[in-house]
Every structure is written in C-alpha cells, then in structure tokens.
C-alpha cells in the first residue's frame, strides 16, 4: 500500500508540475473572441498577447513591455505567484523522486526516505497555494471585467472567456494539493514500517529459542552425597 501511494503521488506530482509550468509560460489565460465578426481570436497571457486569424490561421504575437514597466496589478501578482508555484512544485517533485523506494538513494536508511517523502508532500502542498490563488484570482478578474462590460452595455460583441492556460494552472494546483496529501498521509500511516523496527525482535527470537534448548539439554552433575541419598531412598 505504501508503494502504491508513493507511485500515485509521483504520477500526480509530475503532471501537476508540468501543468503549472506550461500554464505560466503560455499565452492563453484569457480568450477574447469577437462573435459578431468571427475574424480573429485574441489570447492574452502573462507575458504576451497573440491574435490568430480565423481564415488563414496566421498567428501574430506581441510581447508586453519590460518587466520593469508599469503593468496591471493582476498581471504582476499572477506572474509572481505562478513562478513561485513552479519553483516549489519542481523542488517537491525532485525530492519525491529521491524518496521513492525504487530509487537507489540511501537504500540502507528507509527512515530518511520516509522523511524525504514527507518534505516533498509538504512542499507540494505549499506549491499548490500560490498556484491556485494566482489562477483563481486571474479567472475572477476576467469574469468581473466581462460582467462589468455587459452591465454597462459596452462592447457586447466581445466575449471574455477563460483560456486553457488558466484551467491548466487550476488543475496543476489541485494536483499538487492531492499529491501532497497522499505523501503526508503515507508518512503517518507507514512511519513504523521498516527493517530497523523489526530488527530487535528478530534478534531476540532466535536467542530465546537457543536459550531454551540449551536449558533443556543441560543437566547438572550429581555429587557423591546426592548419589548416596538416591541409593538410600531406593532401598
């Protein structure tokens, strides 16, 4: 059961880390589609904005200004949160790989491997926090912006939708939470499992068996007085 939980957590961790990295460095966090004309589709990301022509499929992208330039608060905070989530998730995944039983790293000390799994789980849990905050905050801001335009009857032909990059960020964050929960639960459920826990019992058992057999085979020698007493009692 321990190995199954570790492999399940590793599977979730690798995909969650990949989702977070792809979400951070792609350009489809918000889709701006003109349904009235259906000429082009505009995708806005954290680093650049791309427009795709609906007829010929030509895609042109414009990078944002330098990171030192003034940007909206939503963009700056989401960048910082997603980069933090990427770094933490990557560190947690590498730590988890070192803690797996199938990886030949410190094979003679299973307790260190258990601790590595716990550290990896804690790191993944922490990584999911900035990831989900950044993704949900961006999505809520997109929804609020769209609702405000509809409320004020402005640019009704333009629709703002969540792009697949935003969904990947949410999925990666939830995967980090689930992988971290599996690893931390795995540590507490199986913390007493290990060869060193059974070592004293294994040593005591043959020793006690040998002691019993030696006690049975040992016979105390009879003295002359004991022999004479035995003869007298027989008579």
Curated annotation (Swiss-Prot):
Compartments it resides in: Cell junction, Tight junction; Cell membrane
Chain ranges on the Extracellular side, renumbered to this chain: 25-79, 137-169
UniProt feature coiled coil, ranges: none
GO cellular component: bicellular tight junction; plasma membrane; tight junction
Molecular function GO labels: identical protein binding; paracellular tight junction channel activity; PDZ domain binding; structural molecule activity
Cytoplasmic side: 1-3, 101-115, 191-235
Tissue specificity comment: Expressed in the corticomedullary axis of the TAL, specifically in the cortex and the outer stripe of outer medulla (OSOM) zone (at protein level).
Transmembrane region(s): 4-24, 80-100, 116-136, 170-190
Its biological purpose: Forms paracellular channels: coassembles with CLDN19 into tight junction strands with cation-selective channels through the strands, conveying epithelial permeability in a process known as paracellular tight junction permeability. Involved in the maintenance of ion gradients along the nephron. In the thick ascending limb (TAL) of Henle's loop, facilitates sodium paracellular permeability from the interstitial compartment to the lumen, contributing to the lumen-positive transepithelial potential that drives paracellular magnesium and calcium reabsorption.
Self-association and partners: Can form heteropolymeric tight junction strands with other claudins. Interacts with CLDN19. Cannot form tight junction strands on its own. Interacts (via PDZ-binding motif TRV) with TJP1 (via PDZ domain).
Annotated family: Belongs to the claudin family.
Name of this protein: Claudin-16
The organism's taxonomic lineage, starting at the top: Eukaryota, Metazoa, Chordata, Craniata, Vertebrata
């Amino acid at each position: 059961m321990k190995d199954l939980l570790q492999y399940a957590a590793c599977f979730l961790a690798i995909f969650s880390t990949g989702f977070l990295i792809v979400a951070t460095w792609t350009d489809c966090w918000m889709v701006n589609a003109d349904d009235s004309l259906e000429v082009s589709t505009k995708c806005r990301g954290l680093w650049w904005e791309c427009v795709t022509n609906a007829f010929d499929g030509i895609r042109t992208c414009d990078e944002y200004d330098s990171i030192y330039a003034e940007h909206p608060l939503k963009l700056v905070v989401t960048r910082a949160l997603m980069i933090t989530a990427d770094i933490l998730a990557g560190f947690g995944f590498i730590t988890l790989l070192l803690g797996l039983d199938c990886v030949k790293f410190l094979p003679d000390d299973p307790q260190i491997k258990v601790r590595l799994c716990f550290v990896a789980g804690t790191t993944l849990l922490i990584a999911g926090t900035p990831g989900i905050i950044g993704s949900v905050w961006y999505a809520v801001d997109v929804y609020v912006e769209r609702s405000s335009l509809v409320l004020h009857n402005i640019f009704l032909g333009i629709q703002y939708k969540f792009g697949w990059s935003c969904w990947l960020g949410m999925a990666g964050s939830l995967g980090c939470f689930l992988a971290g929960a599996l690893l931390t639960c795995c540590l507490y459920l199986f913390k007493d499992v290990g060869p060193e826990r059974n070592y004293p019992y294994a040593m005591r058992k043959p020793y006690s068996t040998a002691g019993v057999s030696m006690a049975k085979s040992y016979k105390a020698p009879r003295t002359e007085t004991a022999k004479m007493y035995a003869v007298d009692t027989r008579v």
